[in-house]
């Protein structure tokens, strides 16, 4: 992908005339200008006089018609497009107006930059939801892909990926109990902070004094959730320990939290109990035995890469040898559902290095492999280095995983997209049949309530009508305590 960025520090102005349809327009701009900041102007129909680049989007009502006009100045080029449609209003026809502006802006930016995003116009984080309405209506794969391509201009490879993912999910979602809920526990501590990470987490070195008090409050929160689950006669379907790195706790501390879960919830209907062991250097036989004793049946051992030089660059204080040791330790402890996370596009990594990582992971034969595309979030140290990271060969790495993993019996079972993902790529979980993570599927499908406990956890309440209410806990451990 060519370098299309100019002055990265100067905001890119976007002018809205006759409407205020900002959200989707900004999303389209970010596809082509992923780390630029934007200035949004509403009280003018023109770019500022000193602007060397920017976009103008105008909506005018002309009798029985609406005039849509888009002009883009970028990379020394100026392109514009004008279209007329039957009269529509941004107040009463918001989605339609957004779609028309998005399509026009997308085509102009595509022509100027010579970039052809594989996901086309699709900006949402849950592509599988675009497929699901067709599955119950008897549409074939070819028919579904044709319809989505016509509307969103998605590439054949991505269409096949999202369709195959939806097909794997369908029977698992059909088995979800009507009164089922998932329980998420946040353990926001890590041995060290990775340079790419923007999650609210604290290194053990800095925050070890906070842990006892934090766990005490977490267990108190579990008592409250447990009471609510009993009163409402709900069924705990899945439990997921995330973070952070849950195994940065000691075995005794893990037992404290696991006991609180066991004492406050009926786990007899549980379909999945997952703990993100995460960092290989935090995994010990004692911790694995503790997890196994409390019924945990799925864990993650997350190397992110099997290149020692890259691990050092991103601030992960473990080696590939420790990853192999931790994985074998988990197998010896009796875990038969182990996931391994990889990240495509890490600083210092190359297509050759990623290929070598894939080969080493496949040799270990985990039960599932999740491939993330590096996301430049504003809270991460890497964001400041965004200019050099925006156009690295992430797409090539992701495509290799899409090809190699199915060859070894792994099928895509869940996926999601994020803003500021390098090369506009996606995160995909691949699994052997029967080893899919139910929690991962459910959180993306948004069809089941999730009760979040701990710092930074989010609760998602899904009503029978489909309406979703989100409740966010405090992000910082000190505030939570």
Task: Tell where the protein language model's regions lie, with residue ranges.
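Flexible glycine/acidic-rich beta-alpha junction loops that bind and position SAM and/or redox cofactors
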Residues: 309, 313-314, 344-351, 366-391, ...
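Canonical Radical SAM [4Fe-4S] cluster-binding loop centered on the CxxxCxxC motif
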Residues: 179-215
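Conserved small/polar residues in nucleotide/adenosyl-binding loops
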Residues: 479-481
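Short Lys/Arg-enriched alpha/beta "domain-start" segment
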Residues: 10-50
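N-terminal [4Fe-4S]-dependent radical SAM core
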Residues: 113-116, 136-183, 232
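Short, well-ordered secondary-structure micro-motifs within conserved domains or adaptor modules
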Residues: 36-80, 85-90
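Conserved non-cysteine loop/helix-boundary elements of the Radical SAM core domain that shape
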Residues: 201-401
């Amino acid at each position: 992908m060519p370098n299309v960025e100019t002055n990265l520090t100067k905001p890119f102005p976007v002018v809205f005339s006759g409407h205020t349809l900002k959200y989707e327009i900004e999303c389209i701009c970010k596809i082509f200008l992923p780390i630029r900041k934007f200035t949004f102007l509403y009280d003018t129909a023109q770019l500022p006089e000193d602007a060397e680049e920017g976009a103008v989007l105008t909506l005018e009502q002309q009798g029985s018609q609406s005039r849509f006009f888009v002009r883009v100045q970028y990379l020394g080029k100026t392109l514009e497009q004008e279209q007329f449609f039957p009269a529509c209003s941004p107040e009463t026809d918001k989605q339609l107006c957004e779609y028309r502006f998005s399509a026009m802006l997308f085509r102009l930016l595509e022509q100027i930059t010579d970039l052809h995003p594989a996901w086309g116009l699709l900006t949402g984080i849950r592509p599988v939801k675009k497929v699901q309405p067709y599955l119950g209506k008897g549409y074939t794969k070819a028919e579904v892909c044709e319809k989505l391509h016509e509307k969103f201009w998605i590439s054949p490879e991505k269409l096949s990926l999202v369709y195959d993912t939806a097909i794997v999910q369908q029977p698992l979602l059909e088995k979800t109990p009507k009164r089922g809920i998932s329980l998420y526990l946040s353990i926001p501590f890590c041995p060290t902070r990775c340079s790419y990470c923007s999650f609210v987490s604290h290194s053990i070195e800095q925050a070890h004094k906070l842990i006892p008090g934090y766990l005490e409050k977490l267990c108190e929160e579990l008592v409250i959730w447990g009471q609510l689950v009993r009163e409402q006669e709900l069924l705990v379907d899945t439990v997921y320990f995330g973070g952070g790195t849950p195994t940065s706790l000691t075995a005794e501390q893990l037992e404290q939290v696991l006991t609180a879960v066991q004492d406050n919830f009926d786990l007899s209907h549980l379909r999945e109990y997952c703990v993100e062991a995460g960092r290989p250097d935090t995994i010990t036989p004692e911790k694995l035995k503790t997890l196994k004793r409390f019924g945990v049946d799925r864990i993650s051992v997350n190397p992110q890469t099997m290149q020692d030089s890259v691990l050092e660059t991103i601030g992960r204080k473990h080696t590939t040898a420790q990853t192999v040791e931790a994985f074998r330790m988990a197998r010896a402890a009796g875990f038969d559902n182990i996931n391994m996370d990889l990240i495509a596009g890490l600083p210092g990594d190359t297509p050759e290095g990623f290929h070598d990582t894939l080969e080493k992971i496949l040799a270990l034969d985990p039960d599932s492999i999740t491939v993330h595309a590096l996301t430049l979030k504003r809270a991460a140290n890497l964001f400041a280095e965004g200019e050099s990271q925006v156009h690295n060969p992430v797409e090539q790495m992701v495509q290799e995983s899409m090809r190699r993993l199915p060859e070894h019996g792994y099928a895509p079972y869940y996926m999601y997209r994020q803003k500021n993902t390098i090369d506009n790529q996606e995160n995909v979980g691949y699994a052997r049949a029967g080893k899919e993570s139910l929690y991962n599927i459910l959180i993306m499908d948004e069809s089941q309530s999730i009760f979040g406990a701990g710092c930074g956890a989010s609760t998602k309440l899904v009503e029978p009508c489909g309406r979703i209410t989100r409740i966010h806990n405090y992000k910082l451990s000190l505030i939570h305590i």
